[in-house]
């Protein structure tokens, strides 16, 4: 009997893990036991194999299917060994250009407008390299990604290679019915992450008259067309008082999630509004007030407050971002960041960075972990400076000998956010990435765990720790 790997499954392996497989549309590969992989490798339409219990199991799981002799798997489904560390996703900044000039842009090292942009030829080359490295999906960002002259062509090329776009970060000003129709015709159904910084303040922070109106119109249009919408909302001393009415407006529109992001001390924001940052304790206090009010509001939109509390009104549950390893799972291992070890970030200059949120600060410090215009993606995703930082684990952080090494809370927070560790370390080299995140220190040492539990009494805590 002849078998083939189904068109909905792709078999892969990487240098840092054994066999794994993707299901179509899945962002992360699933591990595959060696004995199952050994059988799947023979399911190529060329080998006449016995229908054993293992084969039947693989058929029932939808991993293989009977076929005729010579009917092998598709090029996407066929086994491919990737000679690099596994990073299944890329956060791609396709252009630094933007039709806005936001006060807080974290991609910028100063107030100069970013003008760097990937050429379409280089983007196609990057997609081919990503395919060879086992990447399956992209988040597209900018600048404003849709100002790239070949934006829709880029999306088409991603899907032509059997990869997907799972999210689009946009200011919404270029979203039209025609664009949404074209995305759907391509098969692209991303989460629309649309910036909206509070009623009456969005135009100010984006430095564009009419930005608020266009962002709200874009959200309504996306909801009407059944795209999932997340509002990304900067929160600072200027606009924090608008967060509850803003949440009510977004919930009424049908936005499925609101992410409130503390406007951070990145170079451009420090130059433009140095006194507008909420201090860390001030931020926790204002966000706890917001969460308490939101819990009583009856709204159904999911909430995430940056580095603090996430809320799921549908089942009245909440989780705590500082608690990375909850009771029963805390340990001295585990990745420092749940994102950087699965998603590489690439800037419009071609720099590879742990996350785009720290790209402007790294640029200001003159720190480069590699550039795709001079080094291949495979090389950058092999064992080296970038992968050691992106895959830094809690043991690495403890070994650095800073505060985390002896902290009683370390087994829960794992050191916290590496971008904040660098930002507040005072260091000007990558050594700063090994310092503690002071926001997490404040959370545990300042009793914020208990304060959140008390404020959300009656809601299920998904991040319990041993009190």
For each predicted feature, which ranges?
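N-terminal pre-core extensions flanking Radical SAM catalytic domains
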Residues: 1-110
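Short Fe-S-cluster ligation motifs
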Residues: 126-142, 432-467
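Short, acidic, Ser/Thr-enriched surface-loop or helix-capping motifs
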Residues: 24, 346-349
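Local cysteine-cluster metal-coordination motifs and their immediate loop/turn environment
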Residues: 97-107, 354-357, 401-420
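Iron-sulfur (Fe-S) cluster-binding segments and ferredoxin-like electron-carrier domains
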Residues: 107-116, 359-367, 410-453
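Radical SAM/AdoMet-radical enzyme domain recognition
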Residues: 120-141, 148-279, 283
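C-terminal accessory region of radical SAM enzymes
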Residues: 281-324, 357-405
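Short, small/polar residue-rich loop motifs at catalytic or cofactor-binding pockets
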Residues: 336-341
């Amino acid at each position: 009997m002849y078998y083939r790997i189904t068109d909905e499954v792709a078999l892969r392996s990487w240098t840092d893990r054994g066999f794994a497989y993707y299901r179509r549309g899945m962002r992360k590969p699933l591990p595959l036991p060696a004995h199952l992989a050994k059988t799947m490798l023979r399911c190529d339409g060329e080998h006449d194999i016995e229908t054993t219990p293992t084969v039947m199991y693989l058929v029932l799981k939808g991993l293989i299917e009977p076929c005729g002799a010579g009917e092998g798997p598709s090029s996407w489904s066929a086994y491919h060994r990737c000679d690099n560390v596994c990073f299944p996703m890329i956060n791609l900044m396709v252009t630094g250009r933007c039709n806005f000039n936001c006060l807080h842009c974290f991609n910028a090292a100063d107030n100069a407008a970013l003008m760097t942009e990937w050429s379409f030829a280089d983007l196609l080359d990057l997609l081919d390299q990503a395919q060879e490295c086992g990447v399956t999906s992209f988040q597209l960002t900018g600048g404003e990604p849709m100002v790239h002259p070949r934006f829709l062509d880029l999306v088409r090329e991603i899907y032509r290679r059997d990869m997907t776009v799972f999210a689009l970060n946009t200011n919404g000003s270029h979203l039209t019915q025609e664009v949404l129709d074209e995305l759907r015709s391509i098969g692209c159904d991303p989460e629309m992450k649309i910036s909206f910084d509070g009623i009456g303040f969005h135009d100010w922070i984006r430095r564009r008259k009419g930005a608020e109106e266009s962002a709200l119109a874009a959200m309504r249009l996306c909801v009407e067309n059944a795209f999932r919408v997340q509002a990304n909302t900067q929160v600072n001393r200027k606009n924090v008082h608008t967060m509850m009415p803003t949440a009510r407006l977004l919930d009424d529109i049908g936005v499925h999630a609101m992410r409130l992001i503390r406007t951070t001390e990145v170079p451009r924001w420090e130059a433009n509004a140095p006194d507008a940052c909420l201090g860390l304790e001030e931020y926790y206090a204002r966000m706890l007030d917001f969460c308490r009010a939101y819990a009583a509001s009856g709204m159904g939109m999911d909430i995430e407050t940056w580095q603090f509390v996430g809320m799921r009104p549908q089942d009245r549950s909440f989780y705590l971002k500082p608690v990375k390893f909850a009771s029963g799972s805390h340990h001295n291992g585990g990745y420092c960041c749940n994102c950087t070890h699965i998603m590489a970030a690439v800037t419009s200059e071609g720099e590879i960075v742990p996350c785009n949120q720290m790209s402007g600060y790294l640029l200001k410090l003159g720190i480069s972990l590699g550039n795709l215009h001079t080094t291949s993606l495979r090389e950058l995703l092999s064992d080296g400076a970038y992968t050691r930082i992106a895959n830094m684990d809690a043991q690495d952080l403890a070994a650095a000998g800073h505060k985390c090494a002896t902290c009683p809370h370390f087994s829960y927070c794992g050191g916290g956010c590496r971008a904040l560790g660098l930002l507040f370390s005072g260091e000007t080299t990558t050594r700063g990435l090994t310092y503690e995140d002071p926001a997490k220190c404040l959370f545990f040492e300042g009793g914020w765990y208990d304060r959140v539990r008390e404020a959300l009494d009656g809601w299920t805590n998904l991040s319990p720790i041993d009190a």
